Amino acid sequence: MPADLTVTSKHDGSTIQVNGRRIGVAKGYALVVLDPETGDVRSHETFNTSWYREDSERLARFIAALPGGAPVVVASEFDVSRMLTAEAVAALGSLGLAEDLRGRFNVLHAAIGVKGAARGTALEAVHQDAATVTIGAPQFRIVELNGLELR
C-alpha cells in the first residue's frame, strides 16, 4: 500500500487518516479511493445506508465503477445496517471485505481493501464500540481528551 493509513470507526467522530491528512466521516459508510501508485486521495464519498436505501444502491454503483486494483478505505459511523442491501454488501465484498452488517444495528466497521480482491482478504475490523485498522506508520498521533478539570 503506497500510503500510511489509519481508519477509526466510532459512533460519533469516525476518521480516516491518509498520510497524516484527516478525512471526517458522516453517518453511514465513508469510502476513500486512493491512487494505487502514489497513495493520494482520488475521491471520497459518504453513504448513509442506515437511513436511505438509495444510498446503498449508490454505494454499489460507486464501487462497481472503480477500476480494478484501486485501494479503498472504508469507515462507518453510527449505524450502516438498516437500509444496507445485498447488492451493497456484494460490492463491499468486491473490495475484499467479508463482514455483512445487515441486521447488526450500531456495529462499527473499518477496513482497507482493493477493488477486485477476493472476499475476506481485506484488512478489516468490526466491533460494537470502536473498530480500528492501520497500515504503515501514521504520521500524526491523535490525542483524544475526554475530560479536563481546571483548579
Tell where the protein language model's regions lie, with residue ranges.
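Short acidic-hydrophobic catalytic motif
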Residues: M1-P71, S76-R151
